[in-house]
């Protein structure tokens, strides 16, 4: 019986063994699928809004919704790219020496899948609401206001998920499994920790609504684009250093 079970035990041990290379392709695949699903949805949502043009609604209303939809998609792609680049850089530099690092990687990828689905749900619900209000003949101001404020709970949940993902990446970099890359891993740990903290603060954008305001401080898509722009400026030096490190390793 032990002889017959030996191949199965060897297979299970192989699956449980920590190996960074086993994660590389999976990481690329998960982030690519998330981006693809969101990209496929964009034309359908845009066409649903455009189909309401003959409802005698101001073209500026349709244009405003389409522009904000494009802003949200752009912000989403930038965030997914940033998550992917930090995740893969940390994994490539640190390697994996412990089973708990595999669990951390799995949690990050699971949140990526959930996040992509959550974004699609938010945009679908916003588009459906806008179509209903346009067909009902509501004013331009009401349509745009409801578009921005609709799905507040889902948007906050999305920001908190991103914060958790960056926090998990910080823990992954903190393991410093590769002693030759301690300096780079420390920089990545610090950056991901700061990003996690910033995304924990972003839900404060909706704080005025608790005190009677009808809108948040700013549309969340625009806030994330501003964050991305500032992030790219501040992290240019780190990116150059990591690029040189990866070139040297190859």
Residue spans of the language-model regions?
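Multi-pass alpha-helical transmembrane bundle typical of ion/small-solute transporters
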Residues: 2-250
């Amino acid at each position: 019986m032990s002889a017959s079970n030996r191949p199965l035990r060897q297979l299970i041990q192989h699956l449980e063994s920590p190996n960074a290379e086993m994660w590389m392709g999976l990481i690329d695949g998960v982030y690519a699928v998330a981006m693809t699903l969101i990209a496929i949805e964009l034309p359908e949502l845009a066409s649903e809004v455009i189909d309401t043009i003959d409802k005698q609604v101001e073209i500026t209303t349709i244009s405003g919704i389409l522009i904000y939809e494009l802003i949200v998609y752009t912000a989403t792609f930038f965030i997914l790219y940033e998550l992917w680049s930090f995740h893969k850089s940390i994994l490539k530099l640190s390697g994996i020496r412990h089973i708990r690092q595999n669990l951390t990687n799995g949690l990050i990828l699971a949140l990526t899948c959930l996040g992509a689905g959550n974004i699609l749900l938010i945009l679908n619900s916003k588009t459906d609401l806008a179509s209903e209000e346009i067909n009902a003949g509501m004013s331009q101001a009401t349509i745009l206001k409801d578009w921005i404020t609709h799905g507040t709970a889902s948007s906050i949940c999305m920001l908190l998920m991103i914060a958790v993902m960056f926090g998990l990446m910080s823990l992954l970099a903190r393991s410093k499994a590769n002693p030759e890359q301690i300096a780079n891993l420390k920089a990545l740990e610090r950056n991901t920790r700061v990003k996690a903290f910033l995304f924990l603060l972003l839900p404060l954008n909706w704080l005025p609504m608790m005190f009677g305001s009808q809108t948040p401080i700013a549309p969340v898509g625009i806030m994330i684009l501003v964050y991305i722009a500032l992030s790219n400026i501040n992290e240019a030096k780190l990116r150059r250093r990591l690029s040189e490190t990866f070139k040297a390793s190859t």
